[in-house]
UniProtKB/Swiss-Prot annotation:
GO terms for molecular function: rRNA (guanine-N2-)-methyltransferase activity. Keywords: Cytoplasm, Methyltransferase, rRNA processing, S-adenosyl-L-methionine, Transferase. InterPro entries: 16SrRNA_methylTrfase_J (IPR007536), SAM-dependent_MTases_sf (IPR029063). It is found in: Cytoplasm. The gene is rsmJ. Its EC number is 2.1.1.242. It catalyses: guanosine(1516) in 16S rRNA + S-adenosyl-L-methionine = N(2)-methylguanosine(1516) in 16S rRNA + S-adenosyl-L-homocysteine + H(+). This is Ribosomal RNA small subunit methyltransferase J. It is an enzyme of class 2 (transferase). One of its GO terms (cellular component) is cytoplasm. It holds the Pfam family SAM_MT. S-adenosyl-L-methionine binds at R101, D102, E117, R118, S153, S154, D171. It comes from the Bacteria.
Length: 254
Protein backbone atom coordinates (compact mmCIF):
# COMPACT_ATOMS: atom_id res chain seq x y z
CA UNK A 1 0.00 0.00 0.00
CA UNK A 2 1.35 3.42 -0.96
CA UNK A 3 1.49 6.22 1.61
CA UNK A 4 3.87 9.04 2.48
CA UNK A 5 6.20 7.76 5.22
CA UNK A 6 7.78 10.34 7.54
CA UNK A 7 10.28 9.89 10.39
CA UNK A 8 10.28 12.77 12.90
CA UNK A 9 12.15 10.92 15.64
CA UNK A 10 15.59 12.12 14.58
CA UNK A 11 16.95 8.74 15.62
CA UNK A 12 18.14 7.67 12.18
CA UNK A 13 17.92 4.03 13.22
CA UNK A 14 15.99 2.75 10.20
CA UNK A 15 12.87 2.06 12.27
CA UNK A 16 10.64 3.51 9.55
CA UNK A 17 12.05 1.10 6.96
CA UNK A 18 11.43 -1.81 9.32
CA UNK A 19 7.87 -0.61 9.87
CA UNK A 20 7.26 -0.26 6.12
CA UNK A 21 8.59 -3.76 5.43
CA UNK A 22 6.52 -5.29 8.22
CA UNK A 23 3.22 -3.83 7.04
CA UNK A 24 3.87 -3.86 3.29
CA UNK A 25 3.94 -0.07 2.93
CA UNK A 26 5.59 1.80 0.06
CA UNK A 27 6.74 5.41 0.38
CA UNK A 28 4.89 7.79 -1.94
CA UNK A 29 6.04 11.38 -1.62
CA UNK A 30 2.97 12.69 -3.46
CA UNK A 31 0.40 10.85 -1.34
CA UNK A 32 -1.94 13.13 0.61
CA UNK A 33 -1.98 10.65 3.50
CA UNK A 34 1.11 10.41 5.69
CA UNK A 35 2.10 7.85 8.29
CA UNK A 36 4.39 9.69 10.68
CA UNK A 37 6.72 8.24 13.28
CA UNK A 38 7.04 10.84 16.05
CA UNK A 39 9.13 10.51 19.24
CA UNK A 40 5.92 9.64 21.12
CA UNK A 41 3.88 7.46 18.75
CA UNK A 42 2.88 6.56 15.21
CA UNK A 43 0.21 8.81 13.70
CA UNK A 44 -1.79 9.34 10.53
CA UNK A 45 -2.06 12.79 8.96
CA UNK A 46 -3.97 14.29 6.04
CA UNK A 47 -1.28 16.44 4.47
CA UNK A 48 -3.63 18.81 2.65
CA UNK A 49 -5.52 19.53 5.89
CA UNK A 50 -2.83 19.94 8.57
CA UNK A 51 -5.27 21.59 10.99
CA UNK A 52 -6.95 18.21 11.47
CA UNK A 53 -3.85 17.04 13.32
CA UNK A 54 -2.67 13.46 13.67
CA UNK A 55 -4.74 10.36 14.39
CA UNK A 56 -3.13 7.81 16.68
CA UNK A 57 -4.11 5.01 19.04
CA UNK A 58 -3.61 5.60 22.76
CA UNK A 59 -5.06 3.07 25.18
CA UNK A 60 -3.23 4.36 28.27
CA UNK A 61 -3.99 8.09 28.20
CA UNK A 62 -6.35 10.63 26.68
CA UNK A 63 -9.94 9.93 25.69
CA UNK A 64 -9.75 6.15 26.07
CA UNK A 65 -8.29 6.38 29.56
CA UNK A 66 -11.02 8.84 30.54
CA UNK A 67 -13.68 6.53 29.14
CA UNK A 68 -12.20 3.58 31.06
CA UNK A 69 -12.10 5.49 34.35
CA UNK A 70 -15.26 7.58 34.13
CA UNK A 71 -17.38 5.93 31.42
CA UNK A 72 -20.25 3.55 31.93
CA UNK A 73 -18.13 0.40 32.15
CA UNK A 74 -20.47 -2.57 32.15
CA UNK A 75 -23.31 -0.13 31.58
CA UNK A 76 -21.93 0.99 28.22
CA UNK A 77 -24.17 0.06 25.30
CA UNK A 78 -21.50 -2.05 23.61
CA UNK A 79 -21.00 -4.10 26.79
CA UNK A 80 -24.75 -4.64 27.12
CA UNK A 81 -25.01 -5.57 23.46
CA UNK A 82 -22.37 -8.32 23.59
CA UNK A 83 -24.13 -9.71 26.66
CA UNK A 84 -21.85 -8.81 29.58
CA UNK A 85 -23.79 -9.75 32.70
CA UNK A 86 -22.73 -10.92 36.14
CA UNK A 87 -19.75 -13.24 35.76
CA UNK A 88 -20.41 -13.74 32.03
CA UNK A 89 -17.66 -12.00 30.04
CA UNK A 90 -17.81 -13.28 26.46
CA UNK A 91 -14.84 -13.96 24.24
CA UNK A 92 -15.19 -11.45 21.37
CA UNK A 93 -13.80 -11.09 17.86
CA UNK A 94 -14.00 -7.45 16.76
CA UNK A 95 -13.95 -7.98 13.00
CA UNK A 96 -13.75 -4.27 12.08
CA UNK A 97 -11.37 -2.96 14.73
CA UNK A 98 -10.68 0.52 13.35
CA UNK A 99 -8.96 2.52 16.09
CA UNK A 100 -9.87 -0.07 18.72
CA UNK A 101 -12.18 2.04 20.89
CA UNK A 102 -15.04 -0.42 21.36
CA UNK A 103 -12.63 -3.35 21.64
CA UNK A 104 -10.82 -1.51 24.43
CA UNK A 105 -14.07 -0.83 26.28
CA UNK A 106 -14.91 -4.54 26.16
CA UNK A 107 -11.41 -5.52 27.27
CA UNK A 108 -11.53 -3.01 30.14
CA UNK A 109 -14.67 -4.64 31.57
CA UNK A 110 -13.06 -8.09 31.38
CA UNK A 111 -13.77 -9.55 27.93
CA UNK A 112 -11.03 -11.18 25.87
CA UNK A 113 -11.03 -9.45 22.48
CA UNK A 114 -9.27 -10.36 19.26
CA UNK A 115 -9.21 -7.41 16.87
CA UNK A 116 -9.21 -7.94 13.11
CA UNK A 117 -8.00 -5.11 10.89
CA UNK A 118 -7.29 -5.51 7.20
CA UNK A 119 -5.92 -2.05 6.36
CA UNK A 120 -2.15 -2.19 6.95
CA UNK A 121 -1.89 1.47 8.00
CA UNK A 122 -4.68 1.12 10.56
CA UNK A 123 -3.17 -2.17 11.74
CA UNK A 124 0.18 -0.42 12.21
CA UNK A 125 -1.51 2.32 14.27
CA UNK A 126 -3.26 -0.31 16.41
CA UNK A 127 -0.05 -2.28 16.86
CA UNK A 128 1.79 0.85 17.97
CA UNK A 129 -0.97 1.69 20.46
CA UNK A 130 -0.97 -1.86 21.81
CA UNK A 131 2.82 -1.86 22.26
CA UNK A 132 2.64 1.29 24.36
CA UNK A 133 -0.43 0.01 26.20
CA UNK A 134 1.24 -3.31 27.00
CA UNK A 135 4.18 -1.41 28.51
CA UNK A 136 1.97 0.83 30.66
CA UNK A 137 2.33 0.07 34.39
CA UNK A 138 -1.37 0.68 35.07
CA UNK A 139 -3.10 -1.26 32.30
CA UNK A 140 -0.32 -3.30 30.67
CA UNK A 141 -0.81 -6.59 32.49
CA UNK A 142 -4.52 -7.04 31.77
CA UNK A 143 -4.30 -5.45 28.32
CA UNK A 144 -1.82 -8.14 27.19
CA UNK A 145 -4.19 -10.84 28.40
CA UNK A 146 -7.37 -9.43 26.91
CA UNK A 147 -6.62 -7.43 23.75
CA UNK A 148 -4.84 -8.81 20.70
CA UNK A 149 -4.48 -7.77 17.06
CA UNK A 150 -4.81 -9.97 13.98
CA UNK A 151 -3.89 -8.25 10.70
CA UNK A 152 -6.20 -9.93 8.18
CA UNK A 153 -9.31 -9.37 6.11
CA UNK A 154 -12.45 -10.19 8.04
CA UNK A 155 -14.02 -11.64 4.90
CA UNK A 156 -11.48 -14.48 4.90
CA UNK A 157 -10.32 -14.59 8.52
CA UNK A 158 -13.81 -15.12 9.92
CA UNK A 159 -13.77 -18.66 8.53
CA UNK A 160 -10.39 -19.54 10.05
CA UNK A 161 -10.38 -18.21 13.61
CA UNK A 162 -9.93 -20.71 16.42
CA UNK A 163 -11.06 -21.05 19.09
CA UNK A 164 -14.45 -19.73 18.04
CA UNK A 165 -15.60 -16.64 19.94
CA UNK A 166 -18.93 -16.38 21.68
CA UNK A 167 -19.51 -12.99 20.05
CA UNK A 168 -18.49 -11.37 16.77
CA UNK A 169 -18.69 -7.57 16.80
CA UNK A 170 -19.04 -5.58 13.56
CA UNK A 171 -18.84 -1.81 13.15
CA UNK A 172 -18.41 -1.27 9.40
CA UNK A 173 -17.56 2.18 8.12
CA UNK A 174 -20.72 4.10 7.27
CA UNK A 175 -20.93 7.78 6.23
CA UNK A 176 -21.47 9.86 9.36
CA UNK A 177 -23.98 12.68 9.57
CA UNK A 178 -22.83 13.94 12.96
CA UNK A 179 -21.16 17.33 13.00
CA UNK A 180 -19.17 17.00 16.22
CA UNK A 181 -15.56 18.15 15.91
CA UNK A 182 -14.10 14.78 16.91
CA UNK A 183 -16.18 12.72 14.51
CA UNK A 184 -15.62 15.26 11.80
CA UNK A 185 -11.86 15.30 12.27
CA UNK A 186 -11.31 11.58 12.69
CA UNK A 187 -13.74 10.52 10.01
CA UNK A 188 -12.31 12.90 7.44
CA UNK A 189 -8.82 11.55 8.01
CA UNK A 190 -9.95 7.95 8.41
CA UNK A 191 -12.30 7.83 5.43
CA UNK A 192 -9.67 9.49 3.25
CA UNK A 193 -7.51 6.46 4.00
CA UNK A 194 -9.92 3.53 3.99
CA UNK A 195 -13.16 4.76 2.40
CA UNK A 196 -16.54 3.13 3.08
CA UNK A 197 -16.76 -0.62 3.71
CA UNK A 198 -18.43 -1.46 0.41
CA UNK A 199 -18.19 -5.21 1.08
CA UNK A 200 -19.50 -4.98 4.65
CA UNK A 201 -22.73 -6.80 3.81
CA UNK A 202 -20.65 -9.90 3.15
CA UNK A 203 -19.49 -10.01 6.78
CA UNK A 204 -22.80 -10.88 8.43
CA UNK A 205 -23.15 -14.49 7.30
CA UNK A 206 -19.58 -15.64 8.13
CA UNK A 207 -19.83 -13.76 11.42
CA UNK A 208 -22.99 -15.68 12.34
CA UNK A 209 -21.32 -18.96 11.40
CA UNK A 210 -18.30 -18.15 13.58
CA UNK A 211 -19.97 -16.78 16.72
CA UNK A 212 -21.31 -19.41 19.11
CA UNK A 213 -23.72 -16.99 20.83
CA UNK A 214 -24.40 -13.77 18.93
CA UNK A 215 -23.29 -11.22 16.38
CA UNK A 216 -23.53 -7.53 17.28
CA UNK A 217 -23.58 -4.91 14.51
CA UNK A 218 -23.14 -1.24 15.40
CA UNK A 219 -25.04 1.09 13.06
CA UNK A 220 -25.82 4.81 12.99
CA UNK A 221 -29.48 5.24 13.92
CA UNK A 222 -30.31 6.34 10.36
CA UNK A 223 -28.59 3.38 8.64
CA UNK A 224 -30.40 0.30 7.32
CA UNK A 225 -29.57 -3.06 8.90
CA UNK A 226 -26.42 -4.76 7.64
CA UNK A 227 -27.10 -6.83 4.48
CA UNK A 228 -30.74 -5.71 4.86
CA UNK A 229 -31.24 -8.46 7.44
CA UNK A 230 -33.68 -7.06 9.98
CA UNK A 231 -33.64 -8.02 13.65
CA UNK A 232 -35.97 -7.06 16.48
CA UNK A 233 -33.22 -7.47 19.07
CA UNK A 234 -31.15 -4.31 19.54
CA UNK A 235 -29.59 -2.01 22.12
CA UNK A 236 -30.21 1.62 21.19
CA UNK A 237 -28.41 4.82 22.17
CA UNK A 238 -28.88 8.45 21.21
CA UNK A 239 -27.12 8.17 17.85
CA UNK A 240 -26.59 4.46 17.27
CA UNK A 241 -28.13 1.07 17.61
CA UNK A 242 -26.47 -2.28 18.22
CA UNK A 243 -28.35 -4.89 16.16
CA UNK A 244 -28.10 -8.37 17.67
CA UNK A 245 -28.25 -11.60 15.65
CA UNK A 246 -28.02 -15.20 16.80
CA UNK A 247 -24.81 -17.14 16.26
CA UNK A 248 -24.51 -20.64 14.85
CA UNK A 249 -24.77 -22.53 18.13
CA UNK A 250 -28.10 -20.89 18.92
CA UNK A 251 -29.44 -21.54 15.42
CA UNK A 252 -28.38 -25.21 15.40
CA UNK A 253 -29.82 -25.78 18.85
CA UNK A 254 -33.29 -24.79 17.77
Amino acid sequence: MKICLVDETGAGDGALSVLAARWGLEHDEQNLMALVMTPEHLELRKRDEPKLGGIFVDFADGAMAHRRKFGGGRGEAVAKAVGVKGSYLPDVVDATAGLGRDAFVLASVGCRVRMLERNPVVAALLDDGLARGYADPEIGAWLQERLQLIHASSLTALTDITPRPQVVYLDPMFPHKQKSALVKKEMRVFQSLVGPDLDADGLLEPARLLATKRVVVKRPDYAPPLADVATTNAVTTKGHRFDIYSGTAEVSAV
